[in-house]
Amino acid sequence: SILKETPYVVAGSMQRHQQTATLALNECFPEAEIITDSAWNEFNHQQVFAQYEPRFNEPHLLKEDVAKEDNPRAYLAKIFEGAIERWTGGDYHHEYEESWPDFKTRVETALQNLCDELAKTKPRYAVVFTSGGVISVAAGKVLGLSPNKTFALNWAITNSSMTTLRLVGNEPQLLSLNEHHFIKV
């Protein structure tokens, strides 16, 4: 185990967050309590893609389009970039269940609330099980990044990777991002 004692644990309420948290903790710290907080949930990718291109409201159509391309990853990156630019751009906030400013505020508030709680309770370690968009926004906040640079991070984040922050008082500092050398392929 990377950690020397039972951590303070938070997980988003999405199934993948809960499953990953349970699996990881059962291996290392079965006694750990998981605090579920939906503020750590991912944004609605499907809606962000569908508002950019209505056909993509059917996820299989996006998969079919991507599969037809000579360079599927580059094509998907282009679609992702366009969809994110539309979502974060400001002209269409009213068209989303959760606008970019609302998502950004939700994540930044969750991060600050966690930092405040950890500064008070002072556990040696804390672990949050969440998703790439949330991690990108949290890292973007700490680093002062623009939405475009924030989502450039999102595109690079690997599932089950680790990002490490440390607290100075109740202010987070980024120590590492997207560590995944421990994942065996």
Describe these PLM feature segments.
Residues 146-171:
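Domain-level recognition of soluble alpha/beta enzyme cores
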Residues 1-5, 110-112, 116:
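ANL superfamily AMP-binding
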Residues 132-136:
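GST superfamily/GST-like fold recognition
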Residues 17-20, 99, 103-114:
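Alpha-helical packing segments of well-folded alpha/beta enzyme cores
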Residues 2-78:
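Phosphate-coordination/substrate-recognition cap region in phosphate-metabolizing enzymes
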Residues 61-102:
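Short glycine/proline- and acidic residue-enriched helix-loop micro-motifs
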Residues 10, 123-130:
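Beta-strand elements within well-structured catalytic alpha/beta cores of enzymes
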Residues 172-185:
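Acidic, His/Gly-rich catalytic cores of divalent-metal-dependent hydrolytic chemistry
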